[in-house]
Amino acid sequence: MSNSNDPIGVSDVRLGIPVADQRASTRAYQILLGAPVSDGEWAAANGTVLLRDADADLSIDFVVADEARARAELARRGLSPTGEVSIGVTELTRPRPDGPVLDHIVLTHRDEDAAIALYAGRFGMSLRRVRPLGDELVQLFFRTSTLVVEVVAGPAMAERELFGGIAWLTDDIDAEQERLVEAGLDTSEVRVGRKPGTRVCTVRERVLGTPTLLIEQSPRSDDPS
């Protein structure tokens, strides 16, 4: 979990994803997540996906209890809301629904130490694990109070997009994979995941605007990787 004493106290995440074809993207997300709560917006139990115009910027905002207080604390820690990092904070605008659950999101950063300083030092997330990948790359696993934030960090990420993808949790990946295929979404076969006790499949639809994974965890463990 995140540091409960941290005055920022990040929890859920709100993702603004630019897409080229709003109609096709809306259809794909309706199949994947169900009916939107408003035009182009889907609410999960621990996050929100908002479709944006193709020329809009990607937005990543972590949910906090008090946005003004969190912004003031972030500024005190040296992170300006108008700085180069396109990550911010927002308040929860509606009750959390019973619905889809985010397992984790994937972000990238050009430098391991700077990533730790940003997510742990400034946003107050708990760094749970560091996994070397070779070639000066590492996976950093942070926790908020409601989800895992995976950051792939190293020099090779300098030219990569900040947002690397999203993973949705499912209780029955075989049934979910079959449902998506029957509904017309290009979805891979189910395979064993990297984390012990997990099985995954990839939803290979570019109209989703980001790499998308389904993950089944059995049993659920505290290991964030």
Task: List each language-model region with its residue ranges.
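Short hydrophobic/aromatic beta-strand micro-patches
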Residues: 18, 61-65, 108, 167-169
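DNA polymerase sliding clamps and clamp-related checkpoint/processivity subunits
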Residues: 47-56, 60, 64, 83, ...
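Short proline/glycine-enriched turn/loop motifs at strand-loop junctions of beta-rich domains
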Residues: 22, 67, 170-174
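A short, sequence-level motif marking secondary-structure junctions
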Residues: 53-56, 154-158, 217-220
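Vicinal oxygen chelate
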Residues: 1-9, 17, 68-104, 134-150, ...
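Core segments of cupin and vicinal oxygen chelate
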Residues: 1-49, 53, 72, 77, ...
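Eukaryotic phosphotyrosine signaling hubs
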Residues: 12-13, 56-60, 163-164
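Intrinsically disordered, low-complexity segments enriched in Gly and acidic/Ser/Thr residues
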Residues: 143-145, 149-183
